[in-house]
């Protein structure tokens, strides 16, 4: 399997830490070049330095992906340094809580709703809008959107804005798969369950334990397990797979 992505450029948003980093490192390990976009400027610069020290071709760009002009600048910078991308992973996502709790509709400030929609949904349109012209011209491309099991079934540990945006990504995935198919560009989505990321360390242990107990495999997933599924969608092995949503959830909230 080594070298599946030799000389291919993959752009990953929300790529500093957790699932995003696992995806970037998966591409790099198999010969790819990694465009890393994240809001964490200090962490991103250190991450890029570490990747380059290990001999990888990587380019970090600090950006607020809720703003189109910053997405555009990031895409252009990565294209200039690494070449145009044939793989785009829209991984970025936020799920705000207040005192560790997801707010109900009557409690949620409209600004919070707007911010989640901007980051989780608008950014996916922006990045896909920017990346697909090259893919269409080359008749080669992979777009992978990071949805969630919360976009497929009710999940009481997230708020409505997160569920709505992740469900929206499923709709975009299917629509774009139909639009781009004749150009040999595939569009698929992943729907992770509870994944053991650094962010989960801020969640009370009893919540994660409860999720593990109602998951068929009786454990949380790892970022690397999500990355493995992402790399499959991005690979030539998935060239005849498009418009699909793959749960990576260990049997939690099976749909």
Segments (PLM) and residue ranges:
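Short C-terminal tail/terminal secondary-structure segment
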Residues: 2, 99, 153, 231, ...
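Conserved glycine-rich cofactor-binding loop
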Residues: 16-17
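Catalytic Tyr-X3-Lys loop
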Residues: 86, 94, 106-126, 140, ...
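Substrate-binding pocket helix/loop in short-chain dehydrogenase/reductase
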Residues: 99-105, 109-117, 200, 211
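Active-site helix of classical SDR
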Residues: 128, 165, 173
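Alpha-helical segment proximal to the catalytic Tyr-Lys
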Residues: 133, 152, 177-179, 239
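Residue(s) in the substrate-gating loop at a strand-loop-helix junction
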Residues: 148
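Short, small/polar-rich loop/turn modules that mediate ligand/substrate recognition or access, typified
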Residues: 181, 186, 241-243
């Amino acid at each position: 399997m080594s070298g599946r992505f030799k000389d291919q450029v993959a752009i990953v948003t929300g790529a500093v830490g957790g699932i995003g980093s696992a995806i970037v490192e998966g591409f790099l390990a198999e010969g790819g070049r990694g465009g890393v976009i994240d809001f964490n400027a200090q962490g991103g610069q250190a991450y890029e330095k570490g990747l380059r020290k290990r001999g990888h071709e990587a380019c970090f760009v600090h950006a607020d992906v809720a703003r189109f002009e910053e997405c555009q600048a990031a895409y252009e910078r990565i294209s200039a340094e690494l070449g145009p991308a044939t793989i785009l992973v829209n991984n970025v996502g936020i799920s705000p809580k207040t005192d560790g709790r997801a707010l109900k509709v009557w409690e949620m400030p409209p600004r919070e709703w707007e911010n989640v929609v901007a980051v989780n949904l608008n950014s996916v349109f922006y990045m896909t809008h920017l990346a697909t012209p090259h893919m269409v011209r080359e008749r080669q491309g992979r777009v992978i959107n990071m949805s969630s099991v919360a976009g497929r079934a009710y999940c009481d540990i997230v708020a409505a804005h997160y569920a709505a945006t992740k469900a929206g990504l499923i709709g975009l995935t299917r629509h774009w798969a139909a639009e781009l198919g004749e150009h040999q560009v595939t569009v698929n989505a992943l729907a992770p369950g509870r994944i053991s990321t650094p962010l989960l360390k801020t969640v009370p242990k009893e919540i994660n334990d409860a999720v593990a107990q109602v998951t068929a495999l009786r454990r949380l997933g790892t970022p690397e397990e999500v990355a493995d599924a992402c790399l499959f969608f991005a690979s030539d092995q998935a060239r005849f797979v498009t418009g699909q949503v793959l749960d990576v959830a260990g049997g939690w909230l099976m749909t």
